Structures are given as C-alpha cells and as structure tokens.
Amino acid sequence: MAETNHSKRISELRSLLNKANHAYYILDSPLIEDAVFDRLYRELIELEKQYPSLVTPDSPSQRLGNKPATKFESIKHRIPLQSLDNAFNFDELNYWHSRMQKHLKSHSAMVCELKIDGNALALSYVNGVLTRGATRGDGAEGEEITANVKTIVSIPLSLHLQNPPAWVEIRGEAFIPNKVFISLNKERLKEEKQLFANPRNACSGTLRQLDSRIVASRHLDFFAYTIHLPDDWIPGETDPKKPKGQWEALLWLKAAGFRVNPNAKLISQPDQVEKFCIDWEKRRHQLPYTTDGIVIKIDDFKLQKTLGITQKAPRWAIALKYPAEEAPTQLNKLIFQTGRTGTVTPVAEFNPIPLGGTLVSKATLHNANRLSELDIHEGDTIVIRKAGEIIPEVIRVIKELRPNNAKKLVLPEKCPECNSKLLKETGEAATKCLNNDCPAILRGVLRHWVSKGAMNIDGFGTKLVEQLVKRKIIKSIAGIYELKEKNLENLERMGTKSAEKLLIEINNSKKQPWHKQLYGLGILHIGEANAKAIAEVFPSISLLADAAIASPESISNIYGIGSEITESLHKWFNCSINQNLIKELKDLGIALERVNEEGAIDNILMQEKLQFSGKTFVITGTMPSLSRANLEELIEREGGKVNSSVSSKTNYLVAGEKPGNKLKKAKELGIKVINEQELMTLISN
C-alpha cells in the first residue's frame, strides 16, 4: 500500500518537474519558483532512492548519469545523416533554385532556417521515451552518447504526445551559447589551459566527455529541425497532425516538447529568400549563439521525395554559407607574456582591423608549438580570423609578402620578466618559468587571489597589484593581509580614504567560502567548478592536504576530478613553499575550511542537505592516509555520528588494517563494512 502511494507521488512529481523544465527552458515562462523546484526535485530523488523500481527513463533524475562512461560505443544510424551541399554566393543559390524548378515544373514554397554552428545529433524515442542519443559521425555511423544528451535540458526525456509513435528519430543541432562559451574560455584562461577555438569545437569536445557531470556543467542547448516518423503513425486527439512538409515538421517538434529556432520562416516567393539571407547576415552578431549560414529547404515532403538525394546530400536543400570573418594585417611585433603558473605565451600585436563588429589588434598564439607551426617572421603579413566570431586567432602567414631577410621569431630561452631559464617538460606544449620569485608570476597569483571568483576584493585592481609588486611591498598572497595604511597611502590613485576602504575589503574577504579560498590558491588545473566539487568532499585544507599527499586516489573518486588534477594537488601540497603559505594564511585569519556565517566550523548545516544524517559510524584499525580525527571530522560534517563501539544501531564500520574484535562483531550483526576509500566514494557521490 505504501509503495502504491509513493508511486502516485513519484508520478506526480515527475510530471510536474518535467512540465516546469519545459516551461523554463523551452517556453521561457517559469511555472514555479527555483526554490520550490529544488525542494520538489529533492523529494523525488529521496523517493526514488527508497523505491528504485519506480525510477523511469523520463524522470528528471535521469538527466545526470551515476558514473562516468569508460568509452563510447560506435552505432550504425538507422537512417544516414547526410550533409548539405553549400552555396557561397547568391549566384550559386539561384542556380540551385532554377535547377529545382526545372525538376518540379512548378513553384514550391521554401523554409529558411538559420544554420547553427554546432554539432548534429540523432535522438531516438521509443514509445515516446528517449532511448538513444548519437553523434553524426561520418553520417553512416556515429557514437552513442545518450548519457551526455540527457544533460541537455532543452531535449525532452519523453515526448509531449498523447499517442507517441512506436519509434521516431529527431535530429537537430547541439550548441554552446556564446555567453557560456566566453565563460568557459575565461575559466580555461585562468587555468592556463588551451582555449577552445570556437563554440562548435567547445560543443564537440563537451559532447565527447566521458563524465556527463562535466557536460551538464557546460549548459549545452539544442534546436530540433528534422523528424523521421513511421508511415503508420496515427496521432492522438490532442497531438499535432502528421506533417506534410518542413514547416509543419517544425510545428510538430515544438508541440512535442522541443526547442525550435524561432527565426525560421516559410517563404513563398524566391526573391524573399535572398532578402532573408541578407537580413540575417547583418543581424547574426546580435544572436546569443553562433550561426554560419542559412539552410534553405523545399517545404513539401512529396516534392522532396520527387527530387531525391545524391550519394552525399539531398537535392531539395542547400546551405548558403556566410563569408568567413577573416582579414590580413601586418605583424608589428611578437611579445611574450609570463602567466601566474609560469607559462610563457606568445602574443601577436598587429595593426587594428575590424572583425565581427569589433576592432582587433592582438591574438594569442597559446604556445611554442603553434608559433613553430605558423613559422612567423618579423614583419609578416598574417591572416586573422575571429574564430567562432569571438576569439581572434592567427590562422596563416602570407609568405609571398614576407620582407627580404626577415628574421624567424622563436620562443626565448629565458623568461621575458625575470631572465630565468625557461623549461619545457616532455610531452607538454607549455614552456615555463620556474622561478618562484618571478614578478610576473607573483602579479598573476595576486590578481587571481583577489578576483571575483576567488576572494572578491573590490578595489584591488591590476594597477595596484603592479605597484605593490614593483615596490616589493608584497611577496605572496599572505602579504595582502599584512598591508597597513602607510603601505597604501602614497601609491597612485590611493589616498587615506581609499586605503581605509581597501583594508576593510581585505578583512571582509576572510569570510569568503572555503571553495573560493581553494580556487584562489591558484593550484594548476583547479578551476571554480573543480574547487567547489573538492571542497564539498574535503571540508578543510588539512583534510585535503592529507589526502593529496598520502592518498591522491581518494580525490579522484570525485566526479570530474581526473589524474591530471590529483597529480597537480599532490605536487602543490608537497611543496614546502605552499605548506608555509597555508600556515601564514591561517595565522592571518583565513580559515581555509568550511565555516558558517558566525565564523564557527560548519557543523550546523541543514540536516536534509547532509547525506550521513541519522547514520552512525564506528572506526577501527589503522587507515592508509587519514587519521582517526580526520575521519571523524569528515563523517560529522556530513551529518553522521561516530561511536566508539559497535551495536545494532551502527550503520557503517570503517575498517583499516588490524581492525580487531569490532570487525567480527559488525559481521555478526550484518553491519556494512567499508574501507577508507569506500567512505570517500560515499562522500563524493
């Protein structure tokens, strides 16, 4: 009886949350408040944990996978995904249209759609439920990425139809919105990782992530544009009728719960097609996503069938491609910049050129490998492309215009800032300065610590950082908290009042959350998202340091944290300079651990947010990396209670080496026995 009641409640929650998602992401008309959604979603999760047999594939809880995939399976497309023929000007477009008219012998309406610069996906729905998502691949075969597809909230997990087809395939374009792309690259820039060249590459790389949590964090979007319905499908009373053309197909997709690009247009006159294309080429930079052309399709499905397909493309459609955003300019000079992790990056400076509605005068070459590939010389004429209409990049050199006796430009052997010898590790693209006293590295470290994503110290700008480093007033981030008015008053743009205000901001920054403090330390490969994930599992820097030094694998159990990050943490915490920095920061009042609003260690978090609430643990034996005190702290901060003896009320026995009689008693009572690593996995999950 209880399960029946819970089944009804789960069904109600599932239906309401799916409707709320559709209203928020597709209709842009929120149905319920975020806080209400969160509470209902949490209730659904808890009920599904209690009754796993009641979980359905279309439950909102299924958007995020339980564990990363090990690899993607290659699958054969039921219907091949063909590419489109391209037209690069209106003469070619008109030639295509005149050929169509000859075959059709009568005028036909056309549908014009914006060509989204993303990645094509094929989505299979069986009896209305999403069962498979796949990449285009070579058109005949793609990769099955269903777990990643489910994280895209604009893709419904079930069709909004009364009588869904036994099988239907939906096709469309996954893409990264421009704001998300810019934010993602800013994060990578802070971590000194190679930037994504454009949103399409970022989307492609995201879809191929084995961990769906990473995919979810990048907020991909999706526009549907094609359906493959079975001939025998009969719509329900409230369902849209079976479409007879592309325009009706878009309406069908919208009714079935998909996001359809709102700028598509049904056009009856050929001259209107050209007008549509010209209009959108001018307006495309105003869109929140990138487009690289216009797709024109004959509307009528019967006429499409008459026209047929070639070996690689349908005859009834064509893509008019926008001209590339490229321009030549002369290289003025190549400068080399040392970043906060010591990486030296070549940056091309050139005569300003207009691209994508902005003036561009610089382009980063990322690393020595790219510099070598381009073979840049002094005074070269270089071609700049605003890749993805956002990031300027040098794409080639016009060698025919190279000045006589021009000198080849190469990465320097010494740091441009401190003159220390540069080193390049085997297999790495980056060349680095390893001098801990390098002023450029210190400036970068300070800017990172005071940034909005870290300690958020308002008024601590770049000019101030430069002055403090140049005058040797500060030698580490700890020095920020030792500043006095007398250190600041005589600096540029700094009077007594400004100094007082800044010192208040510095003191207030000590209250920043633990995950922001961790991010601010600037550990290689630790971005904002990774710092937050790590801080949720390790509530203090002492616990994190113990694990990083003695048991890095316990950190790799956290979703999204791979060997690159664990190695970086291991190296950072083993460095005596960093160990001294931690001590200095703690002495100066930065807790480097999770605290509540009153400044106490946060043991009073809401119980429903702590996964060990109501659970009792007993610890026995010697652990491989963490002390008993560390383990107790971890368990208690997750809401659990630690007892000294095993009883029938014990939920878990955490056993290390030489566990003694407690292990025997736990087995007799049927109590779950776990080791240290399994405890860390429980916490990370």
From Swiss-Prot:
The keyword Manganese applies. Coiled coil: none annotated. NAD(+) binds at residues 34-38, 83-84, 113, 136, 173, 297, 321. It catalyses: NAD(+) + (deoxyribonucleotide)n-3'-hydroxyl + 5'-phospho-(deoxyribonucleotide)m = (deoxyribonucleotide)n+m + AMP + beta-nicotinamide D-nucleotide. One of its GO terms (molecular function) is DNA ligase (NAD+) activity. GO terms for biological process: DNA repair; DNA replication. The keyword DNA damage applies. InterPro entries: BRCT_dom (IPR001357), BRCT_dom_sf (IPR036420), DisA/LigA_HHH (IPR041663), DNA_ligase (IPR001679), DNAligase_adenylation (IPR013839), DNAligase_N (IPR013840), Hlx-hairpin-Hlx_DNA-bd_motif (IPR003583), NA-bd_OB-fold (IPR012340). Disulfide bonds: none annotated. The active site is at 115 (n6-amp-lysine intermediate). GO terms for cellular component: cytosol. Keywords: DNA damage, DNA repair, DNA replication, Ligase, Magnesium, Manganese, Metal-binding, NAD, Zinc. Its cofactor is Mg(2+); Mn(2+). Zn(2+) binds at residues 415, 418, 433, 438. Its EC number is 6.5.1.2. Residues 607-685 form the BRCT domain. Belongs to the NAD-dependent DNA ligase family. LigA subfamily. HAMAP family: DNA_ligase_A. DNA ligase that catalyzes the formation of phosphodiester linkages between 5'-phosphoryl and 3'-hydroxyl groups in double-stranded DNA using NAD as a coenzyme and as the energy source for the reaction. It is essential for DNA replication and repair of damaged DNA. This is DNA ligase. It comes from Prochlorococcus marinus (strain SARG / CCMP1375 / SS120).
